[in-house]
Each structure stands twice: as C-alpha cells, then as structure tokens.
Amino acid sequence: MDLLFLGTSAGVPTKARNVSATAVIEASGSHWYLVDCGEGTQHRLLHTPLSIRDLRAIFITHVHGDHCFGLPGLLASAGMSGRTQPLEVILPAVLHDWVRQGLVASDTFLPFELRLLPVEALIAWRSETLQVTTVQLSHRVPSVGFVFTEINPEPRLDIQRLDAEGIPRGPLWGELAKGLTVTFNGQLLNGNDYLRPSRPPQRVIVCGDNDKPALLAAVARGADVLVHEATFTQAVVERTGGTFGHSTAAEVARFAEAAGVRNLVLTHFSARYQNDPRRSPHIDTVRDEALAHYSGQLTLAQDLQRYHLGRNGLLEASA
C-alpha cells in the first residue's frame, strides 16, 4: 500500500500544510481511499495523480471541521467530474443530515448514488482488495482510527491444490488465475478458491485525534504502519497546561516503541510548528522528541508527499 498526505496541519491550515486528509492507495495503484476530508482537500488533489473517479470510499474519523469541512465540496466536484459509480462515505451519524442538507441547500445534484454509513455501526467494510475496521480512540468528541488490511495480496494460483484435484494445465488455469468461474468435469469452480496470497497482507492504521495512544495496543501490535497525530511537544503542553484531547510526539513514540510498531508516521501538527528553519518552534522539535523514545522507522508526514510500503516492510518516501 501507499500513503499520500493531502493535509497534515491541526485545526487550521498553514502556508505549508493543509488540514487533515490522507489517501490510502491500493498496492495495485488502481484505486484509493480517503481518510478525513478537511477544507481544501479537493484542491490538494489537483496536485496529485489521484483521480476522484478511482476513489473507492471516504472514511471520516470524527466531527471536527478540520477533518470534514471539505466533504460537500469534494462530493460536488466528483459529480461535476462525471463520476457515476456509487460512493460510500463512512462517517459519524450526526454528520449525515449536515452532508445531505448542504447538498440540497446549495442545489447540488450528484449523478452517482451517495451512500452515507454510520461509523458507529461499522464492523468491517470490504472491497475486493481491502478490509477496513475501526478502533475507538479518546478525544473531546468520539473519534476512531481506521485499520486497513489487505485481502489476498498479489494472488497467485495454488498450483499444489490444482494438481491435487487433477485440474489440467492450460486454458482452465488461465481463467482461474483471473478469479473467474469455470466448469470442469461437470462442476463449477470458483477461481478465487484457487488463489493464494504471494506475500503477507499489509496492515495500516490511520488514526483520528487521540489523547490515549494505549487504546491502540490490540491493533498496533504487528501492524506495518501506524499513522498518528502528534499535535504538540511536551514543552508546549507543560507551558499551556493541557493537551486539549491530543497527543504529544513523546507519548506516541513511547507507545509505538513498546508496541513494536515498525513504521510510525506522525501528522496533525499544530500550526505553531514552522518549516522555515529561521523560525521557532521548528517542526524538527517534533521529530527530535519522537526520536528520543522510538527506534523504528520514523516519518513526519509532509503535504503532497507519497510514501510506499515495500516488501521489506519499510515505509519510504516515493520520488
């Protein structure tokens, strides 16, 4: 899987960072999924190779505006771009009427079916290649993380089973390799039953706002990538006297180290952290604080940067 960050700022945008939105891209590169949709997300998409027609589903972690205010505009643009296939949006139930009323009040017609599903009732959402589940987090309002797990990644024919069942090599194998149903000796054979993954499935967790990283203990162990907010550093919290429902870089890093997370991606940075080395506090203070507690592969997400999770298990920036 790949990750492409469309917004990494907390609360408000900055000149360098937009508010929260993250694209999760299938290993095939054909389709993608959007986690959160802060204001301006559709404009950020124009600076990427992602097409809104290839968007499989949208997942909203919680109700705060920096995570959802871009949704009506994105949906309207999807309609104007010619999208016709249905689109499922998994989001807090309280936002359903807000989305629908916004579209109606603005006289927006969608030429595709919009399916709004309550995140509170989500057990598992599935496509042909991914399963998505949730983990409950802690914030000032209900918030969740989304766990993306591959289904049968890079499938190959189960030759041992084919030979054992006496299915001859040739055109039948070619059809089964495509996942098609074929007839052999009067029996119907489902191609998917004869495919097996050629590598272990990847698991990526993309979190909403959260002030208790330990809530991720059950799902983070063994995960390939954890994407988690690091809104503040400890120094800021000590000065302001509270986290306001957010985590510090140190808290997340300590948790990731204890859980054995191989790739930790920090995002959702307070607007106070600067990219300009001449200004303070600099974003490197977030990195330095995390590195003091975490020995794995650490990434500070950057807007419009794409990251690839390779077969070696490492998440690295793509060219």
From Swiss-Prot:
Zn(2+) 1 binds at H62, H64, H139, D209. Its cofactor is Zn(2+). Binds 2 Zn(2+) ions. Keywords: Endonuclease, Hydrolase, Metal-binding, Nuclease, tRNA processing, Zinc. The active site is at D66. PANTHER family: ZINC PHOSPHODIESTERASE ELAC PROTEIN 1. Homodimer. Belongs to the RNase Z family. This is Ribonuclease Z. The gene is rnz.
